[in-house]
Amino acid sequence: MTSSDLYAGLKELEEQIADYNRAKDVDRARAHALEHTIADLLVQTGIADEMGFRAMHEDGTPFEEVVAAAHTAVTRIADTRIPDGMHIFGEVPEGERRVEFIHAIMRYNGEVRDAVLRMTGHDASTADDALLRDAEAAAKSLIAAILEGEPPDRAAERVLGDRLRRLDLEALQKIQDGVLDLAARIDDSDEIGSLLSGCAGGYIPPGPSGLITRGKPEVLPTGRNFYSLDPFRIPTRAAWRIGTRLAESVIQKYIEEHRAIPENIGMYWMASDVMWADGEQLAQVFSLIGVEPVWTDGRVRSYRVVPLEELGRPRIDVTIRMSGILRDCFYSCIELLDDAIREVAGLDEPPEMNFIRKHALEGSGTARIFGSRPGTYGNGVSLAVYASAWKEEADLAEVFLRWNSYAYGRDNFGEESPETFSAQLATVDLTFNKTVTDEYDLLGCCCYFGAHGGLTGAVRALSNRDVPAYYGDTRDRDRVEVRTLAEEIRRVVRAKLLNPKWIEGMKRHGYKGAGDISRQVGTVYGWEATTQEVDDRIFDDITRTFVLDAEMRQFFADENPWALEEIGRRLLEAHERGLWDADPDVLEGLRAAYLEMEGWIEDRMGDAGGDVQGGAVRVVTVGDVKALRGAREKE
């Protein structure tokens, strides 16, 4: 993982914002001139659309507030970490990549950054974004110096220079020990040796798994027979603290935007919540419904129902679409949650203070955890989207219902419950998922848009309401946030997908890198197909970056022309379906480029040395099948 770095207009925008903040109180004439520059850059970078700049301007919003909103948007991108290419099996990071890797590991608990802040006379709890980013840069330089063998005290003096107020020798020694320990663990990795040993029937030593960038250095060295965790320790106490903050944050955001408390929150619950985040989302659900775990020796033995007077708000109902891996690996977590939901549903409380009971009394029952049929995986929606097997959003909603209406709990394992599932979805006020790391994001797999996007589309279709979609962020345990799905898509697209630094990393991997770029563009299309939360500007910029840029087009032509054809085809489909209101010049260029791509493909097919049999494929939707069956029954 590496820092995303700002690029092109985003970097200039950040610099102009910093200049404005310095000038606004001491040089009003310069500040006024910078206002025009900043406004132009906001439009140029697309940040203006994200923050509603036009509406702010029309409403007479003070420019200082405009700048604050712009700073938040830019910082969200700058603080994102991105993969530096892909991992090659058997290789360990060296040089600058090792520095980046170790910094990414130590960044989670903040010990190096916080030591830098203390030694420069600052406090992490009161530091602003710019100061925190400067401290992280210094932390990375300090790690690099230690890896090169420089004593930590001299390294700190050199890196911090005249900013240094006092050396913290104890902290520096601890940092050195941590850096050298991680370096030794990296060097001890033996992925190829373990693979060969396993193939020969040899013993492979066991080791823990998890997200190394969330403070789990014990995952190293790699090449071990990794195991997961004890599910009866989920959620941990640390995850409970984060989960309760998530619950209150999502409620507060909905209240701010809709002037009402949400009655029912639809959620996508993945196994990664258990394996990577120690059950933060499970803790969030507990907090929403008003129960808390009871631990004994670190294991969750039961739960306590929090009285309403202590809770201070109504109990929020939940409708959960869980992943197949969660179902098959961590069923004890499902049973624990199901027990809590059913007990809360049976409490003798006013329905207006217990929305689970309210909806149960209205006929939805008490099943709240749903997934695909036992023994199967997937959500159905991503398959329909990739096959273009849909005509309108209602088709995708029906696919989602058919695939995911199986209820799970203590006393039922995959009981088909379409009526209950539909009744619950119709009362959902918002949908929710969250990110826990920059190693994996909402463009990384079709399951994200298929499940969360499919859930959102189904809720909107059944409720006939424009239900919002939210995304939580617990990448930094000290800065838990909840934003809209549209904001999260913008963050990931700008920080990663359109970032020249990420693109160059992918290009190092040739055919595979080109294929992964295409796959992530396809995921952007999937989000738009299911939720319509992707800005037109994003599709414009994707087209400019990957299709219209001559250098990128040549890369695809040399390495993987089929990947670019897929990108072009999805973009054209987005336009034809009315999902993308394209810039006319961009659309014209796309169409011309796609004709060129078809020529590439035909040339490559000719190299096969034989005839190629084409064919016609007719894709039908569920509705078409019903109509055909009805017509035959009438015959």
Identify the meaning behind each predicted range:
Residues 1-635:
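Ligand/cofactor-recognition surfaces for anionic moieties
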